């Protein structure tokens, strides 16, 4: 009888196995390893995310889900040294720094050459300027998650979610002092990662729920050969309907 009761308690209404949600939120890409770009520390950068997802409940405790999400990974680097193409003497083919791997810009724009701190010290060139470098990589992501219900009473519920995702790069921008200077040539077209989140949900009307969801994302390979903020905090708000 006890086993039968547990099985009955674990069953879910067949009319509510599926749920579709829309959501939007804010995110912050963080530098957790004190990584540097061109000798300068990568700073955190805030962005927005939004998407749609569907979930299938196996029973009252477990569910699986997937969907599509637009998300942006970014970083800011202050006091980056660079030389403008207007300084024609520096871009002369005879200049040894122009071909230096250390001095190669991570931007596709040939009007600017971003240089490391060590190269700047070696050059001691009056044409060297400093500015703020912002890099933004936007992806369309497809997650695959498993959810476990840790609390479900009356109209409120709390779920823990974990899984992985694959993302396709759809936007790649590098800005210097607020002006677009091209793309990061080291960005990978596809990115992979893991995600962990908690969904706090409240039923507002029959099968309609609102939710808030703090989350953590980790990106494995945003760039080929450069450091980049790989850890991201997120906070999503959304609405879902079960059927």
Put a short name on every predicted segment.
Residues 231-243:
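Outer-membrane beta-barrel "beta-signal"
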Residues 14-20, 60-64, 136-140, 154-160, ...:
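Outer-envelope beta-barrel architecture signal
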Residues 20-24, 66, 144, 160-162, ...:
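Membrane-embedded beta-strand positions of outer-membrane beta-barrel proteins
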Residues 32-38, 77-83, 172-179, 223-229:
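Outer-membrane beta-barrel translocator domains and adjoining extracellular loop/strand segments
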Residues 14, 56-60, 150-152, 170, ...:
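Outer-membrane beta-barrel strand-turn architecture
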Residues 49-51, 141-145, 193-197, 236:
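Membrane-embedded beta-strand positions in outer-membrane beta-barrel channels/transporters
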Residues 1-106:
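Conserved catalytic residues of ABC-type ATPase nucleotide-binding domains
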Residues 24-32, 70-74, 150, 164-172, ...:
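Transmembrane beta-strands of outer-membrane beta-barrel pores
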